[in-house]
Swiss-Prot record:
It is an enzyme of class 2 (transferase). The gene is mtnK. This is Methylthioribose kinase. Belongs to the methylthioribose kinase family. It comes from Bacillus pumilus (strain SAFR-032). Pathway: Amino-acid biosynthesis; L-methionine biosynthesis via salvage pathway; S-methyl-5-thio-alpha-D-ribose 1-phosphate from S-methyl-5'-thioadenosine (hydrolase route): step 2/2. NCBIfam families: MTRK. ATP binds at residues 43, 60, 114-116, 249-251.
Length: 397
């Protein structure tokens, strides 16, 4: 349900509860609690819970600025509309893998959705040493279905162009264009890294091959409106348990390249692998890298054979060349994400949480090496196992 209110105002814990009661999403009770639990950079997230009914609710509100910077970095509130619309679209294909949306309000920039507090954020769980045996199965299914069915392969071209317009997301794409594809490759003011990494960062900035390949990847990101991508699919955007997975926070959603989400997810698996002590502890992450690609291919190929409206989909070689291109581009995007999460704005906690300062710096240098390798060699990658081999090679350098 979408309802327009008169004007925007930042919610508080008490006004979030009042809104939920007014909408009939939760009953007024002395047993209600509300806590602002948002740990991201762009939003408030209110967890409302009725302890008598044992029923919860999430109300998420977009802020008109980035919390990580402050009011000097204004942001559009339209991203709340994008997020709720993306969740609803994704739920058409994978309802079991995204939170249910109960209500959205474009003026308040609010989305009310399913409470997932019985699950945990995957990044936090991985840092704590937990394993999620079905993570790559579920993420691979999510990617295979959502990326296929929102593309030209399954959507009438005229309707797809309407979706491209609906999900045009210039402000948040601008963040990605700058923070992932531009600033980390130059001595930019937004970059954030330890002084011990300066030499490695300067070597990256001076590497002309890296610059040329990063420019290629940025161009692909800017110009390839292939499918509805999540836009920020890292391990901090996934809730999970041993049996269940939910992908959240698609406020960066837009029509972009097939490989973008895949590359982001894989990069963040490798970031966690770098925080592990040895290859034995890393192996289940390597398995997820290989399996998420295998599952994506299996799900995508099944949809291709059953539901493609593209005349040329009768060609098996067209499918294989499509997969080959997606994996190559995903590898390059993973490389850019590795660089960004190491020396750019908004690090990955996986590396920042390494207790030993010397070990932390060493693993960040390895992350930069791996990122450069992926960027330079993305055209040569043929299998997901190649990515694991490149990781192992970078660790030894």
């Amino acid at each position: 349900m979408v309802t327009l209110t008169a004007s925007y105002e930042e919610l508080t814990e008490s006004s979030a509860v009042a809104l939920a009661i007014r909408l009939g999403l939760i009953q007024e009770s002395s047993h209600l609690t509300c806590t602002e639990i948002g740990d991201g950079n762009l939003n408030y997230v209110f967890h409302i819970f009725d302890h008598k009914q044992e029923k919860g609710l999430i109300i998420k509100q977009a802020l008109p600025y980035a919390k990580v910077v402050g009011e000097s970095w204004p942001l559009t509130l339209d991203r709340a509309r994008i997020e709720s619309a993306a969740l609803i679209k994704q739920s058409e294909y994978t309802p079991h893998l995204v939170p249910a949306v109960y209500y959205s309000d474009t003026a308040l920039a609010v989305t009310a959705m399913e409470d997932l507090s019985h699950l945990e954020i995957v990044r936090k769980g991985l840092i704590a040493g937990k394993q999620y045996p079905h993570l790559s199965d579920h993420v691979g299914e999510f990617l295979g279905k959502t990326l296929f069915y929102t593309s030209d392969f399954a959507t009438n071209p005229k309707i797809k162009k309407q979706f491209v317009k609906q999900f045009t997301n210039p402000d948040l794409c601008d963040i990605t264009e700058k923070l992932v594809f531009t600033d980390p490759f130059f001595d930019s003011s937004t970059n954030d890294f330890e002084e011990e990494l300066r030499e490695a960062a300067e070597a990256l900035w001076a590497d002309l091959e890296v610059q040329a390949k990063a420019a290629e990847l940025k161009r692909i990101f800017l110009t390839s409106a292939e499918t509805l991508v999540h836009g920020d699919l890292h391990t901090g955007s996934i809730f999970a348990s041993e049996t269940e997975t939910k992908i959240i926070d698609p406020e960066f959603a837009f029509y972009g390249p097939f490989g973008f989400d895949i590359g982001h997810f894989i990069a963040n698996l490798f970031l966690n692998a770098l925080s592990r002590e040895n290859e034995h502890d890393q192996q289940h992450l390597f398995d997820h890298v290989v399996n998420v690609w295998a599952t994506f291919k299996e799900v995508f190929a099944k949809a291709w054979k059953e539901d493609s409206i593209e005349a040329f989909s009768v060609s098996d070689s067209f499918l294989e060349t499509t997969f080959d291109r997606i994996l190559k581009e995903a590898t390059g995007f993973a490389g850019c994400e590795l660089v960004r999460r190491t020396i750019g704005l908004a690090h990955a906690a996986d590396l920042d949480a390494i207790p030993s300062p010397s070990k932390r710096i060493q693993q960040k240098k390895t992350a930069l090496t791996l990122g450069k390798t992926f960027i330079k060699q993305y055209h040569a990658v043929e299998t997901a196992s190649d990515l694991v081999a490149l990781f192992q090679q970078s660790v030894k350098e």
